[in-house]
Amino acid sequence: IELTLMSLLPMAVGWVIILGLMAMLGIEFNIVTIILSTFIFGIGDDFSIFIMDGLLSEYKTGRRMLDTHKTAIFFSAFTVVVGLGALIFARHPALHSLALISLFGIVAVVLVSYTVQPVLFRMLVSSQTEKGGAPYTLGSLINTLYAFGLFVTGCQLLQALIFTLWPLPMARRRKQRIVQWSIHHMTRGFLRAMVTTKTIRLNDTGETFAEPAVVIANHQSFIDILVLLSICPKAVMVTNGWVWRSPVFGRIVRYLGFYHAADGYERLAPALAQKVAEGYSVIVFPEGTRSADGRIKRFHKGAFYLAAELGLDILPICLYGNGMISSKRQPIYIKHGLVVSRILPRTACGDPADYSAQAKSACRQMRREYRKLYETYNRPCNPYFRDMLIKSYTYKGPVLEWYMRVKIRLEKCYTLFDRIVPREGTVVDLGCGYGPLSYMLAMLSDRRRIVGVDYDAEKIETARHSFLRRPETEFVHADLRTAELPEADAFLL
């Protein structure tokens, strides 16, 4: 249905242009002009289908066919314009008006097909896959609009609450506490309301947040902020500039006394001391920015400086899955998946003179814990992987897409293969076809090197041209009877 809508939109725009030109030129809208306009609309239908076919051919295999299609459309339109446009020299007024409608209508339809359709396709599909993300579908657009609509509504309610509390005769810190309590419960409600995600919270230590601490976490997505605010009932956060200046929630974080990292941690410590005295924890992302691939980057020393200056424990929280649901590459795209958080044991702040060693030690601990979550939840049971695998074959033909949907369901998302194939090493997939098993195994473990081999050149071209492809994934067109296969830890046949 998405391709149908993308093909119909240029025709609808062309129809509006034709009607507008008729009104501007004073051409009467009668039965003759209606029939002619419908005829032009039908020609535009063919042009849109040809343009879409060229776009899909390039998207599926990488072969550029759009220029050839545009050339054919140009000569077809030129023939129609010359044939019907010749009527402009007729002396009869009706024939003259028919010629004008034909001339302007065909030109409008061609221009719209040449411009609107490729721009729309690039915006929703090819530009997303070029940066390693999934293409938009109607379902994903609805899900994303639902999530952001829910989020914006919550922010508006919080701003209304702040406005309502403003004239009341009570201390500002009490008002802030009311807003903080509201945020804590609203973020919990938001995560529960996300129908395409499942929230898993692991608190093996029984942490209650009764005592303030410097809470540190790995950073993958803006969802991390919502998750931490839903976990910590009473906390302020050290944020980046984009959070501070956000037109949606910037006013809220400023009202609550959140702090800007650009101010410098030396200046933040005295300001945060008052909040800590009131029982607030301090949330810091030591990486300083979101990770694009989920890997935990080097920790900066600011959080550990604050812990030493304020006399607080370090409380690590390891997050998994947020970067899959809303990645740095595609922040305005909400996907299926798991939101997992694990609260780790507190550690006392160490020697104030050695922040660097503390940061390195905390980073190593976070990477170990993240790897444990990765090995537990980077499995076929995580709905993210099935969703991404199906989306990698979306818009590559209805037969191929539905074949993959059925095959993935029958194979139970390749759970058996993931269980018996080593999670580290080289895996050769003989007769890989379009590559669904190869891509699933590659997604489930970043330590696998996958080599897919198949005799069908078209299938290999399709497999190679996927947004899931990574440097560790290779597809080879070869005859299995004569192919030189690499040494591998597992062969799949």
Protein language model regions, located:
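Membrane-anchoring hydrophobic helices of lipid-metabolizing enzymes
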Residues: 133-212, 391-407, 414-415
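Class I SAM-dependent methyltransferase SAM/SAH-binding core
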Residues: 436-473, 477-481
